């Protein structure tokens, strides 16, 4: 993911599952 936030990247990139995993 472009924005890797340790808090909750899923919220910023909910359409990109790769950001979470």
Curated annotation (Swiss-Prot):
One GO cellular component, as annotated: cytoplasm
Record's keyword terms, sorted: Cytoplasm
Keyword Cytoplasm tagged: yes
Keyword match Cytoplasm: yes
Region (Disordered): 1-21
Top-level taxon of origin: Bacteria
Subcellular location: Cytoplasm
Function: Component of the cytoplasmic filaments that run the length of the organism just underneath the cytoplasmic membrane.
Protein name as it appears in the record: Cytoplasmic filament protein A
Organism in which the protein naturally occurs: Treponema phagedenis
Lineage: Bacteria, Pseudomonadati, Spirochaetota, Spirochaetia, Spirochaetales
């Amino acid at each position: 993911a472009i924005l890797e936030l340790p808090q909750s990247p899923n919220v910023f990139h909910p359409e990109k599952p790769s950001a979470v995993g």
